[in-house]
């Protein structure tokens, strides 16, 4: 029953409860319900990333849940490379958002932010070469050259 309630918390958008309960389930070694073919870490990472991508595309905030789960993805959870790469890509793209929620390096005027975004995107590419960040990284490099002329 606990597993079903945990999934339900995500379904109704109660991410505070869902994440907390999923972390408890992970700590206790509990399995996901039989209709979910992933472990808890993959389920939470997939669910929160899908939600964050939709929110960001509409220009809405994704915190605190994005960072909370991203910390787990980077440190505690062993996820497949493809999903981990998607998280790093999303982290980079979030730093580049314009007023409409689109990743646009030309909208960023701070070199440190651009460099951090490029760092996350490079990590994504290192984990999964087909994650699709090459063009964005080239645009970041161009923007950095504009901001830091020699």
Question: Locations of the language-model features?
Answer:
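Alpha-solenoid repeat scaffolds
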Residues: 32, 76, 80, 101-102, ...
């Amino acid at each position: 029953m606990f597993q079903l309630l945990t999934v339900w918390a995500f379904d109704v958008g109660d991410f505070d409860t869902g994440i907390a309960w999923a972390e408890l389930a992970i700590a206790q070694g509990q399995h996901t319900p039989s209709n979910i073919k992933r472990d808890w870490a993959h389920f939470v990472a997939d669910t929160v990333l899908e939600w964050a991508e939709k929110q960001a595309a509409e220009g809405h905030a994704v915190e605190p849940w994005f960072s909370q789960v991203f910390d787990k993805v980077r440190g505690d959870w062993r996820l497949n490379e493809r999903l981990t790469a998607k998280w790093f890509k999303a982290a980079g793209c979030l730093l580049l958002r314009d007023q409409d929620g689109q990743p646009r390096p030309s909208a960023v005027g701070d070199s440190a932010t651009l460099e951090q975004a490029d760092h996350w995107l490079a990590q994504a590419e290192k984990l999964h070469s087909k994650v699709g960040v090459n063009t964005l990284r080239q645009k970041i490099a161009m923007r950095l050259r504009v901001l830091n002329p020699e």
